[in-house]
Every structure is written in structure tokens, then in C-alpha cells.
């Protein structure tokens, strides 16, 4: 299960999955298609495990944990489509535990916790409560209503807690698209609601809890679709090979994983919130991400299974039915994406903070002292102080950095907010590699001048016609006395004109296999017979360059690593590059805030634009959450997850999506020079899905290295 990071949560997820497998939950779910399935055994066994009360205080019969533990179990239930009223019951209990007085909590929470009471939750508008406590109207599509004894329903800004047999209240059951769900309409005709059954001002909290817990279940269903499709394409053969080797199939599966990771990160963040009264934005982001992922993975699961996925006997359509039902329930009356925009306008666009362990205090004291000392220095001395103290590159090994672990890095990031720290860019990726694989003499000669800003490096990997294939090296070197003669051409070299050195892949053994026979060399770009020609980009800038080598001499002392093992060095450099980009560099200045301003100032109407802006804002927030989950994994030693690979790809495409929409909202102002803050980032963002590995190649990497799909046998 994807939500769990800590060992305790992983163990809980494993127990939940094993229980549902033993109870044949998915088989019971299928039985609901043709007849009323017997779900009582599954419900009873689930209640016996105490999961219904994971989030309920101990004094009311619960375990006293919280939403993080509950969402782990809900993810497992969604994975197996468990046809029990777990979601509405725990949501009702969550609302009561947070917003109800002790009298109501004592009356209902013990029964909701042990499973003797079933709860229902309705968030759709339609119920009206007058000042005398008379309830009229209807709440349609109330989850769990036909089976429930306690109804928790939104009525305006309030929540009413009703017995299902209250005079004036009727429940009409519906046989819906998702037969594993019990859904009904609750109608009230002059129903008298006692004052102690009205939770004043609790509607927003009820909606937020409903969204968070439903998102967790949706993430589980989406993961099941990915797993099923992945297993199928690995074994299903067409045209003499597994269909999972085809790039189009790989990209579908990579997109499924990306959507799930966004949903998981957003749900994880919302569930961790300590202040449920301020969780509305995070809950809306979770709901938006999770429903989109659930619907898209369910649809793609059928597509990837081909004809078999369209059959009644296959489970794929059960997940499609669930996905579309969840999407409808979560958008009934209150669109999560619209709420995302509203929260952003109100300055409430925030999620849970990252809680660091006690040992962070010492690092914080040191970093704070460094910042204070830095402020006392003349500007000309500040860079040297950052280098000497290790705060310029704290994650590097000593003597250049501080060998800072995850906790110290996060503390430094927080304490240095607003402090101007020189950005090394590509030179940082290259010199970090030199610190890892260079000789001692090379490290002494090259690294310190870069850190102190005395010279800079570029990366000489890309060649004409090679595209994203960094191993397609044709630049060659022949052995001469004392070194090598290099001939060839590199292209798309960033900032080469301003660099003194370049780290180049050079083929030294033309008879060796593609990834062998390559040697890494440091080339002095001021050497004779090196020619650098700038390439003008669509923005008008000249960042990229062509670099030509005509019998350029490279001494043996400038060979980095062993001769013939340059690909290993290149992989290290590319890895450093991707970590840096995925960690947050390479962004554009145009953000969601600018998009909201354009939306609010647009003269012409843009139907549906508010939801589109909401999607961008939700994605922008979730990118930060992917990085946060990666940081938490590092802090607790949980090992790497897929977040780093996913973040680089999502961020690049996000930059294009946000500027695309910005151009649309700006209209003619964007093309007449009146909105340069939109137009320039729009043009620049075109390169972000190309540089550092194209989005298409990144999807191949995700599908092969993370999902385990086989490589295309035709690729050499």
C-alpha cells in the first residue's frame, strides 16, 4: 500500500490486506452485481479488529490513534472494493468525535466503533434547518443511508445528527452504478431536530473529513487498477512479445503511477493535519487528486486489458463503477477544485507542516548562528564564509560540505529562507560528481574554485542526433603522448560560453559495446581548437550552445575515472542532475498566484476556467508534498520511494500547463506585449519537458525501473 511510510503503518497495511484476502472481499464485492451479497461476515470480522475506532478517543471505545492510521486501512479496503459500510461509518464517527458535545459522542461513538451502529454521511446541499429546528428538503446520494441508524447530514453551514427513524425523515434506497455501495436519498418533511443534535458551523469540517477518508479509499482502488494492468501487460503477448514492451503501453502505466503518487501524497498530507478546522484546502486537494487518479486508472485498466477488460467476468468494470460513483459523490454540490481556488484567494492554501525530531534543535541553533554571522559580513566575504562553513553545499561530504543528513538539510533550508545563497546550477551537478569519482589531485584542483565562484563548468554529453540517449557518443579521442586528441561535436550545452571547463563523454574504444568504451574527460574550454557557437532559443535567449573539438589535446591528468568507464561517471552526473531538478530547481517564476490574479481580472468569461485553475493549484501544492514525503522517508530511514522520479516529470509538465492556461486567461494581452510575465515563462517552459531527459524518456524510465516493465528488445 502506497500511503504507509513508517514501519508501523506498513505493518498495519499488511495486516489489513491479509485480512481482506482471507475474507475474499473482492469476491464478495463481485457477488453484489447479480444479487444481494452476504456481507455480514466481512463486516463483523472487520469490526472485531477494532479498525472502526482507530480514530476515536479511548473514552468512547476507540483506539485513540488518528486519521493517518485510519487512512491506511481505508486504502486497503478500497484496494479490494470491500462492500461494507466502513467509509460512511468511520466518517460519521470522525465528525462526531471532532464536533459533537460529549452527550452525543457518548450516545453514538461506542456503537459506531464496535460496528453495532452503521453511520451514513451526506454532504450535498438541499436540507434546510430553520431557526426553530425544523428540517426540510432532501440530501441526495447519502453514502450508507439505507443501512444506517445514524445519519450525519450537512444542512447549510451546520450538521444535523439524526436517527434514521426520526418522524418526518424518509430514506429511499437506490441501486446505483456501484453495487458495492449502499446509497440513498434522505428526505425531511418538517422534521423536528432537537437542539443537541445540531452541530453548529460543522459543515466545512464534515465535508473535509468526508473528502480525506474517501480519497484514501480511492487511492487504494487506483493502486489495484495499476497492479492488475501491470501484471497483465507483463504476460500478455502480441506480435511476438509482451505488450508491456510497447512504449505507448508503458506511458499509460507511468501516467497511472504518477496520478496515484499525487493522490497518495495529497491524502497523506491532509490526514496528518493537526487542525481539522483549517484542513479544508488540503482535503479539497486530496479529493481532487484522488478522484482523478481513481477514474483515470480505472478507465486505463480496461483499455490495457483489451477485450477481456470489457467482459462482465473481469473485475475491471467494478473499479470503474466505484471510481465514477466516488467522483460524483465528492463533487455533488461542492466542487473540490472550486474550493481549492477559494482557499487560495482566502490565504488558506496550506497543508500539514513537517514535524522534525528533537535532534533538529542542535542543527537549528547552528544554522541560525551561521545566518546571523553571515549578515554581519561584507558582501564580498559572504560566499567564502558559506564555503568554509559548509553551508553552501551542506549535503556534500567534507571538506566542501557538512555531510548533512536529511534532518539537518531540512533545518538549513528552513533557517536560510530569504538568505541569498549562490546557486551552482549545472556546475554543482558536475563538481559533485568530481567529488565522488575524481582523483585527489583533481578534487583539489577543480572543486574549490567552483564553490568560490572563480570558474564554472558545463556538461558536454548531448550530441547531434542523439536526443535523450546520452550513451550515443560519437565524439572520439585517440591516444597520443601524454594524453588524448579529441574530435567531435556536442550540442544543447547549457551556458558553455560562460564556462572555463566542461565534463565530456568521449568514445575511446570504437569497437566496444555502446555503453562501454566511453571515457569521461574534463576539457579546458579555453584550449586552442575549441569553438563554441551559441544557439538562439525561442525566447530570444542564447543559453544553449554547440561546442566543436578539432584535435583538442586533453592530458591524462584530466581523465575522470578509469579509461573506458565513463558511462559510470555519466550515470552519476545524470543522477545528480535529476535529484536536483526533482528537488525543486528549474522552476518558472509564474505560479498559481499569478494564475488566480489573471482569473479574477479576466474581462471575458472563461467557462470552466475556475476548475482548471483549481487543478493547477492542487498540482502545485502536491509537488511540494512529493518532496516532503521523500524527506520523511529519508528522516526515518524508510528507503527511497518513487517520488523523486515522479517529481521531475510532473514539475516540468506542470510548468507548461500553468503557462498554457495563463496564456488562455490573458487572451490578447498575452500576444500584444501586455503580459510579459506570462508570455516569457510560456515560451521558456517548452524546454522543461526536453532538458534533463524528455518527458517521454522519463516515462519509459518510470515504467521500466519502478514498475519493472521489460525494455523494448529492438532498443540497442
What residue spans do the PLM features occupy?
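Amphipathic, small/basic residue-rich leader segments at the start of a protein or domain
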Residues: 1-86, 335-428, 432-435, 445, ...
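Glycine-rich phosphate/cofactor-binding loops in nucleotide/flavin-utilizing enzymes
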Residues: 2, 13, 72, 91, ...
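Glycine-rich beta->alpha junctions and the first turn(s) of the following alpha-helix
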Residues: 2-14, 78-79, 171-261, 356-358, ...
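C-terminal helix-coil-helix/basic helical segment that borders enzyme active sites and/or dimer interfaces
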Residues: 25-37, 230, 234, 238-241, ...
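N-terminal glycine-rich flavin-associated loop
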Residues: 84-102, 424-441, 467
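A short, Trp-centered hydrophobic/proline-enriched beta-strand micro-motif
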Residues: 114-125, 153, 453-461, 505
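A short core secondary-structure module
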Residues: 122, 138-170, 435, 487-533
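Extended, hydrophobic interaction surfaces within ordered domains
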Residues: 226, 239-348, 677
Amino acid at each position: 500500500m502506497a500511503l504507509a511510510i513508517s514501519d508501523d503503518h506498513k505493518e498495519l497495511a499488511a495486516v489489513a490486506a491479509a485480512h481482506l484476502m482471507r475474507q475474499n472481499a473482492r469476491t464478495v464485492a463481485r457477488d453484489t452485481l447479480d444479487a444481494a451479497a452476504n456481507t455480514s461476515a466481512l463486516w463483523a470480522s472487520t469490526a472485531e479488529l477494532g479498525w472502526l475506532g482507530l480514530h476515536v478517543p479511548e473514552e468512547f471505545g476507540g483506539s485513540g490513534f488518528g486519521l493517518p492510521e485510519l487512512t491506511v486501512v481505508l486504502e486497503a479496503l478500497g484496494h479490494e472494493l470491500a462492500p461494507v459500510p466502513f467509509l460512511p461509518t468511520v466518517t460519521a464517527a470522525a465528525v462526531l468525535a471532532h464536533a459533537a458535545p460529549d452527550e452525543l459522542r457518548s450516545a453514538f461513538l461506542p456503537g459506531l466503533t464496535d460496528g453495532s451502529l452503521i453511520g451514513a454521511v451526506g454532504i450535498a446541499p438541499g436540507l434546510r434547518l430553520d431557526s426553530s429546528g425544523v428540517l426540510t428538503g432532501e440530501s441526495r446520494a447519502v453514502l450508507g443511508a439505507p443501512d444506517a441508524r445514524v445519519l450525519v447530514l450537512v444542512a447549510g453551514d451546520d450538521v444535523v445528527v439524526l436517527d434514521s427513524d426520526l418522524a418526518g425523515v424518509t430514506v429511499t434506497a437506490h441501486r446505483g452504478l456501484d453495487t458495492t455501495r449502499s446509497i440513498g436519498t434522505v428526505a425531511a418533511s418538517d422534521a423536528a431536530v432537537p437542539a443537541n443534535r445540531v452541530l453548529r458551523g460543522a459543515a466545512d469540517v464534515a465535508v473535509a473529513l468526508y473528502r480525506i477518508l474517501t480519497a484514501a479509499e480511492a487511492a487504494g482502488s487506483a493502486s489495484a487498477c495499476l497492479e492488475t494492468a501491470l501484471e497483465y501487460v507483463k504476460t500478455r503477448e502480441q506480435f511476438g512479445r509482451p505488450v508491456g514492451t510497447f512504449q505507448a503501453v508503458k506511458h499509460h502505466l507511468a501516467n497511472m503511477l504518477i496520478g496515484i503518487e499525487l493522490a497518495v501524497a495529497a491524502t497523506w498530507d491532509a490526514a496528518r493535519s493537526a487542525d481539522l478546522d483549517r484542513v479544508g484546502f488540503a482535503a479539497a486537494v486530496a479529493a481532487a487528486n484522488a478522484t482523478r487518479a481513481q477514474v483515470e486508472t480505472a478507465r486505463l485498466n480496461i483499455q490495457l486489458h483489451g477485450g477481456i477488460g470489457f467482459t462482465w467476468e473481469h473485475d475491471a468494470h467494478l473499479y470503474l463503477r466505484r471510481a465514477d460513483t466516488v467522483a460524483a459523490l465528492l463533487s455533488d454540490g461542492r466542487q473540490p477544485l472550486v474550493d481549492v481556488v477559494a482557499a487560495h484567494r482566502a490565504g488558506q492554501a496550506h497543508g500539514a507542516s513537517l514535524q522534525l525530531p528533537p535532534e533538529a534543535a542542535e542543527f537549528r541553533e547552528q544554522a541560525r548562528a551561521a545566518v546571523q554571522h553571515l549578515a554581519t559580513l561584507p558582501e564580498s566575504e559572504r560566499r567564502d564564509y558559506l564555503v568554509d562553513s559548509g553551508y553552501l553545499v551542506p549535503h556534500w561530504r567534507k571538506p566542501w560540505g557538512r555531510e548533512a543528513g536529511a534532518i539537518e538539510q531540512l533545518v538549513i533550508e528552513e533557517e536560510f529562507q530569504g538568505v541569498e545563497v549562490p546557486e551552482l546550477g549545472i556546475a554543482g551537478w558536475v563538481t559533485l560528481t568530481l567529488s565522488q569519482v575524481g582523483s585527489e589531485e583533481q578534487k583539489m584542483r577543480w572543486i574549490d574554485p567552483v564553490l568560490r565562484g572563480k570558474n564554472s563548468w558545463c556538461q558536454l554529453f548531448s550530441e547531434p542526433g542523439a536526443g535523450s540517449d546520452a550513451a550515443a557518443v560519437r565524439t572520439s579521442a585517440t591516444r597520443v603522448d601524454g594524453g588524448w586528441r579529441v574530435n567531435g561535436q556536442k550540442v544543447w550545452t547549457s551556458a558553455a560560453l560562460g564556462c572555463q571547463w566542461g565534463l565530456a563523454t568521449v568514445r575511446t574504444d570504437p569497437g566496444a559495446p555502446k555503453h562501454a568504451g566511453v571515457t569521461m574527460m574534463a576539457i579546458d574550454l579555453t584550449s586552442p581548437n575549441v569553438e563554441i557557437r551559441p544557439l538562439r532559443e525561442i525566447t530570444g535567449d542564447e543559453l544553449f550552445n554547440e561546442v566543436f573539438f578539432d584535435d583538442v589535446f586533453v592530458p591524462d591528468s584530466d581523465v575522470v575515472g578509469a579509461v573506458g568507464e565513463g558511462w559510470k561517471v555519466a550515470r552519476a552526473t545524470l543522477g545528480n542532475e535529476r535529484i536536483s531538478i526533482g528537488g525543486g530547481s528549474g522552476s518558472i517564476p509564474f505560479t498559481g498566484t499569478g494564475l488566480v490574479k489573471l482569473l479574477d481580472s479576466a474581462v471575458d468569461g472563461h467557462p470552466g476556467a475556475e476548475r482548471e485553475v483549481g487543478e493547477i493549484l492542487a498540482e502545485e501544492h502536491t509537488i511540494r508534498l512529493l518532496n516532503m514525503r521523500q524527506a520523511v522517508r529519508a528522516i526515518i530511514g524508510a528507503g527511497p520511494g518513487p517520488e523523486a522520479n515522479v517529481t521531475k516529470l510532473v514539475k516540468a509538465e506542470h510548468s507548461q500547463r500553468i503557462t498554457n492556461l495563463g496564456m488562455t486567461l490573458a487572451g490578447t494581452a498575452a500576444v500584444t506585449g501586455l503580459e510579459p510575465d506570462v508570455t516569457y515563462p510560456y515560451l521558456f517552459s517548452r524546454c522543461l519537458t526536453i532538458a534533463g531527459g524528455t518527458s517521454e524518456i522519463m516515462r519509459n524510465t518510470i515504467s521500466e525501473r519502478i514498475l519493472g516493465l521489460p525494455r523494448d528488445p529492438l532498443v540497442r
